[in-house]
């Protein structure tokens, strides 16, 4: 029989059980002890999941790794809410953007510059910056009536969705008491209701 000795190394915005460096060291330590190490992440480890950093760290220390991709929450969570990220005649493309980074000013500039894109945009880890994200989109030329949705608890009993527009989504989310983690979706696909 297999036995496991799990270490919970969750990372939520503002709440980290360990720093990334400590996680890297723990992975290396357990691997060097001869353990079969499984680093299980929600979503895809290479979409803002630091999976690449962890694999490079292990490989640079002589540890062989095997990666098994997951399904990113950028696609899975909207799908669970009945929102396809692409849909014929509505959205031919989609982009995934982090909503949280050390250099938020340059991120807002990127968001402003991307406002001319006609496709769907999904923001991960951006709930605390929702007002600034929507403001950057509008100041970049995106119409205020562009549909927007915020989804939390995509796969558990805390699931909730709030829909609105760039003009009112931040207020609606605040009034609904939506908390992180959440996925933000902007674009006409928000009005497609598959549920």
Sequence positions of predicted segments:
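Single conserved hydrophobic/aromatic residue that forms the stacking wall/gate
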Residues: 1-6, 10
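Short phosphate-binding loop-to-helix
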Residues: 14-32
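Ligand-binding beta-strand-loop-alpha-helix segment within the catalytic cores
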Residues: 26-33, 38-39, 50-55
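Short beta->alpha junction loops
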Residues: 11-15, 100-101
């Amino acid at each position: 029989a297999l036995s496991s000795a799990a270490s919970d190394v969750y990372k939520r915005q503002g709440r980290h059980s360990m720093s990334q460096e400590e996680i890297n060291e723990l992975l290396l330590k357990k691997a060097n002890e001869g353990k079969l190490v499984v680093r299980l992440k929600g979503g895809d480890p290479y979409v803002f999941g630091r999976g690449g950093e962890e694999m490079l760290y292990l490989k640079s220390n002589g540890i062989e790794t095997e990666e098994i991709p997951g399904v990113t929450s950028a696609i899975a969570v909207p799908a669970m809410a009945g929102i396809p990220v692409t849909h014929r005649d509505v959205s031919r493309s989609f982009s995934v953007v982090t909503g949280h980074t050390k250099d938020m000013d340059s991120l807002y500039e990127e968001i402003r510059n991307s406002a001319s894109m006609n496709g769907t945009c999904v923001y991960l880890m951006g709930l605390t910056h929702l007002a600034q994200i929507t403001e950057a989109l509008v100041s970049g030329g995106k119409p205020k009536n562009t549909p927007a949705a915020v989804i939390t608890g995509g796969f558990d009993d805390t699931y909730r969705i709030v829909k609105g527009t760039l003009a009112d989504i931040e207020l609606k989310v605040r009034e609904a008491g939506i908390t992180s983690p959440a996925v933000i979706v902007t674009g006409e696909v928000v009005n497609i209701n598959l549920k």
